Amino acid sequence: MRIILLGAPGAGKGTQAQFIMEKYGIPQISTGDMLRAAVKAGSELGLKAKEIMDAGKLVTDELVIALVKERITQEDCRDGFLLDGFPRTIPQADAMKEAGIKVDYVLEFDVPDELIVERIVGRRVHAASGRVYHVKFNPPKVEDKDDVTGEELTIRKDDQEATVRKRLIEYHQQTAPLVSYYHKEADAGNTQYFKLDGTRNVAEVSAELATILG
């Protein structure tokens, strides 16, 4: 069961990735984690990646694909894996295909931009404990105060509206073209494509995923 998750930041991919990992026992492969692990391990690919990153450059698609290939041969990926945040672009998707990395399911989480902005911008965090609230969907008992300690809640830099809108623009420019790419792949019988309504509650989306993945 090899799965790619598509969807804008804030579309609920992380929550559902957790559900899939627990239900089906497959690992989530994050390219960021993989790069850090390779650098730490000092592997040949890791040393190459470190050299590029130390120079302040972006790691090449070829190098990331090589890391993905290496990662999916590990024992925990025997029954499959979950890719979130990769591929981000059509050249990356093409490179994956050329490297012989097959994908069984592409799952797109569809949420309108304005709802994503509302979801993210409304988040409030208690920095010390990591407790997360939402002004509309999960408000604290006392406005802007943590329920347990009564301490001030803060807004993460990533959750500020200008940052969220910038990330959405980047997503639509870079990653949205993958939707039509994987539709074509599905039409050619190379994968199965499903679009999920991410505006529903978590349990409803999880239930639909369980039906799709069996």
Curated annotation (Swiss-Prot):
Monomer. The keyword Aminoacyl-tRNA synthetase does not apply. Catalyzes the reversible transfer of the terminal phosphate group between ATP and AMP. Plays an important role in cellular energy homeostasis and in adenine nucleotide metabolism. It comes from Yersinia pestis. Its EC number is 2.7.4.3. Residues 122-159 are annotated as: LID. This is Adenylate kinase. It comes from the Bacteria. The keyword Zinc-finger does not apply. It catalyses: AMP + ATP = 2 ADP. Residues 30-59 are annotated as: NMP.
